[in-house]
Amino acid sequence: LSPSESLNGLTIGALYDDFTSPAENSRCIWAVDKGMPSPMSAIGKGYRSTIAPDLFYYGGRKFIRKNHDGTSTWITSTREPGCLSAAPYEAGSKDGCAFYSGTSDAAAQITHEAAKCYDVLNQLFLEETGVGILPESTAILLKAMLTHGASWEPIAEKLSLAMGSSPKQLSKWLGNGIPNIDRVVECTKERITLIGLGEVKIDEGEVFRLPLPVDFSSRLMKRK
């Protein structure tokens, strides 16, 4: 089953971004600007017109080599740039690490961020109910937290110009954007994250009544 056919899973695309800083030269060039969706990552509608991938995250970069005959090829070296990963030891290697890029790297890093969300959620459940997160609720809660803090705000204008569409249309082709984990797990005087959990049947619903903080009611602001 390919990620594009996923219905309930969280599919992850790759941003052309990492924390290395090598420079271009006359033959080795960047494929796209840093921070843009990677050419290695597919975009568009998935199974039954669902949006896939759901989120994007750091997927590393690799240079493109300009050949003498006018063609171009990806450089697949395990040296910088890229995402630093554990790797089998090679001849002459002392650290067992290598630099890779792609959607698998992005998915691995999102898993790491999901673990952060899990620790926060589990602690909240222990404090409020005396027990941790129920196993049957873990996946849906983590998906909600990762997606809730996601947006295209850092590169929305630049990306919309490249695609020839308005920033509001980006989610129809590229999903929910780039997760901001700190925004979800931390609250401020002007921002809170509410977590609701339960089950509803067909034609049923739940009504939540919450007091509005003073800092919210005294000014106009965007709410997500």
Describe the predicted segments one by one:
Residues 1, 19, 24-34, 70-71, ...:
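Short secondary-structure boundary/capping segments
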Residues 2-5, 48-49, 103-106, 110, ...:
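Active-site-proximal structural scaffolding
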Residues 1, 35-42, 215, 219:
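Short alpha-helical segments and helix-capping/turn motifs at coil-helix boundaries
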Residues 15-28, 36-37, 41-107, 124:
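Catalytic-core environment of secreted peptidases
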Residues 7-10:
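Loop/turn elements at helix/coil->beta-strand transitions in domains of secreted/extracellular proteins
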Residues 119-158:
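An often Trp-containing, charged/polar helix-loop segment at the C-terminal end
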Residues 162-224:
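Secreted peptidase-domain scaffold signal
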Residues 55, 109-120:
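Alpha-helical metal-binding/catalytic segments enriched in His/Glu/Asp
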